[in-house]
Amino acid sequence: VIMGPVPELKGYFCCNGIIPGFSQSGGLGLMSAQWIIHGEPEYDMFAWDLSRFGHWANKAFTKARVGDQYANRFKIHFPYEEREVGRPMRKRPAYARQKEMGAVFGLNYGWEHPLWYAPAGTEAVETYGFTRQNWFEPVRAECLALRNGVGLIDVSNFGKYQIKGAGAREWLDKVVANNVPTEIGRSCLTPLIGVRGGIAGDFTITMLGEDHYFMVGSGIAERYHQRYFKEVARPTTVEFTSLTEAMVGFNVAGPKSRELLG
């Protein structure tokens, strides 16, 4: 099912691709009606939300995924299962190097991103099941390495935004729940509150300069969050720019971080 309001079109809603037909249509119709009338359904519908897909989901990708979904709809689906069909779609500059290092990739809003790294001498392929799989020990080793030493975390998946111009702080204060920073160099963590009072997202906002802010949030939910951003009228003096596709990055983490950077 692909459903929900189209972020780029005001007042335009979708509820399409219901394979089971009438067995789900009543419930999905109710959720759609609540979305239209109240601004949000009573249940979290992100798994069916059309905002999970962006401009990158072209016809070839759509055709491949639809065929795969239909062919596998009655199979047992395992936790953390990743489908290979239609991929890769988008690759970042570090992709080749990460693959060379044994990365097992997942799909995040069209991007290939490393989930974990297979040990040297083993095949970089993930197994699936309801018990501990082959990723458990490598992931455990990564966690211990970060806890006791130092490591690099690819944080390119995060959604990244620049907000600048006269009135930027006032506009952000209306969008998010927390008070945004008023001192240059300061940051704050803040939730984004939905229409029904639930948490629709969480962001880190940093003040880079006078009327200049940098905001980081979930990358896979960027198009989803656009709905909430557009609900608050933005002054013509405030410029809002998505930098998600233009910026990549790594986080240096662990007690020996300073040694690595030094």
Predicted segment positions?
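Internal hydrophobic alpha-helix adjacent to the cofactor/substrate pocket in enzyme cavities
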Residues: 25-47
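Glycine/proline-enriched, intrinsically flexible loops and inter-domain linkers
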Residues: 43-262
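Residues that form or flank phosphate/diphosphate-binding pockets in enzymes
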Residues: 23-24, 224
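Short glycine-rich or small-residue beta-strand-to-loop segments that form or flank ligand, phosphate
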Residues: 14-16, 216
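Active-site donor-binding loop signature of nucleotide-sugar glycosyltransferases
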Residues: 5, 17, 50
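FAD-binding beta-loop-beta segment adjacent to the flavin cofactor pocket
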Residues: 1-14, 24, 137, 141, ...
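Glycine-rich "substrate-gating" loop/helix at the edge of Rossmann-like oxidoreductase active sites
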Residues: 18-22
